[in-house]
Amino acid sequence: MAGGQLNVLSTLDQAKTQWYHFMAIVIAGMGFFTDAYDLFCISLVTKLLGRIYYTDDSKDTPGALPPNVSAAVTGVALCGTLAGQLFFGWLGDKLGRKSVYGFTLILMVVCSVASGLSFGSSAKGVVSTLCFFRFWLGFGIGGDYPLSATIMSEYANKRTRGAFIAAVFAMQGFGILFGAIVALAVSAGFRHAYPAPSYSDNHAASLVPQADYVWRIILMFGTVPAALTYYWRMKMPETARYTALIARNAKQAAADMSKVLHTQIEESADRAETVAVGGESWGLFSRQFLRRHGLHLLATTSTWFLLDIAFYSQNLFQKDIFSKVGWIPPAKTMNALEELYRIARAQALIALCGTIPGYWFTVAFIEIMGRFWIQIMGFAMMTAFMLGLAIPYHHWTTPGHHTGFIVMYGFTFFFANFGPNSTTFIVPAEIYPARLRSTCHGISAAAGKAGAIIGAFGFLYAAQDQHKPEPGYPRGIGIKNALFVLAGTNFLGTIMTLLVPESKGMSLEVISQEVADGDDEEAAYPK
């Protein structure tokens, strides 16, 4: 876009924080609340699924999902998410943010319910049906990443834009916590109604038939808050930046935002016509794109990829780490529902003490410290805490030192969320031109999910004991060495962050070089 900025976009940039900003945070944030609930609640119920469908009463230990089944159940939604991020990111730039936004929510709600209703006459049938619906659930979740980030970015003023996008993403923390709370409540209720002995006391009686309802209720419950926001999601007008810069209808954008901001915004016919005919048209991966944004795309994809290797390998399999350090007793000493209860309690404590505070520290400090320095700090601190876990690992696993391990582990999550887990979501929504913003955010997010898949699938095998792996698994490098690998991954993330531009306090059109602004242009690059 040549020349200065449109009146409607300038008005949005300068707007005071008001009610519609908070409505946008809630509407977009509840999608992320559901995303996190749906993605992470599966880690709560995999042990229960193993007991229900793969228990052999003649063995001394409860049933567990075979390695290939466990990998499929935990990872298939991530595969769907990757595909959804690419597809809906592209579609959001082609059809508009709003028109695609409602469809992703419907897909999430339907597939979440269907996951809980998975059927089959055998264990294989149930798991296959579950994986099918969780893939498409992930596909819908994937669409929420680029669309929610882009919508919030394009609605916000430039002074608090980072905090608003971070607040949307921070709803993930509440989604993870809510999943743990639901699992705690459901398992506690069923334990009270259907008491059972431990597996070691009575193999068959330790698993009550009603346990099959428990995992289904947990998987389906996340649809409730998402469904409640559908009406408001559909009432949101299309973003002014899409309407003005992509649909080339600046007058309509001004009219839409006049209603939202409760102020009269005038857009001259001459200025609107200039935008309609004068916008740049170079496409994704063109020479002009690579010259302006090639390093930016390398930065946002690589840092998100590296972050998610570490983040998802910890988060999806933290229950196994808790078992090693003694927070969750051996499975045979518990019945099925008690094991679920203890896993959920551990996840709730980590979410409450490490995950959620980190997200909201980002909200509080991102407009003070900036995106670049928060991301550098987060990766560096994650590296340090991972090394602090790995180097004296045997010390942490000896009796009397388990609490120290949990504290260190919690700080790792804190600095992931007060760090790259938040900023890798925020930056791609700010630094690309409007016509490619959703697409590039989707590409960056998909790179992250590729890292998550490596973390989720790879950690199952890599963290196995070098001498006594779990049944069905080959020997791995052990948790200690896996923690060293994750520390190295985080250090690489620190290095790649040097390519990330700073976008604090700047108009989206200045950051993406769609308008010239000599005063702000230098700020697009970290000092």
From Swiss-Prot:
Residues 1-21, 92-99, 146-163, 233-292, 370-371, 427-442, 503-527 are cytoplasmic. InterPro entries: MFS_dom, MFS_sugar_transport-like, MFS_trans_sf, Phos_permease. Induction: In roots by phosphate starvation. One of its GO terms (biological process) is phosphate ion transport. Expressed in roots, stems and leaves. The chain crosses the membrane at residues 22-42, 71-91, 100-120, 125-145, 164-184, 212-232, 293-313, 349-369, 372-392, 406-426, 443-463, 482-502. It holds the Pfam family Sugar_tr. GO terms for molecular function: phosphate transmembrane transporter activity; symporter activity. Residues 43-70, 121-124, 185-211, 314-348, 393-405, 464-481 are extracellular. The keyword Lipid metabolism does not apply. High-affinity transporter for external inorganic phosphate. Required for phosphate acquisition in plant. Belongs to the major facilitator superfamily. Phosphate:H(+) symporter (TC 2.A.1.9) family. This is Inorganic phosphate transporter 1-1.
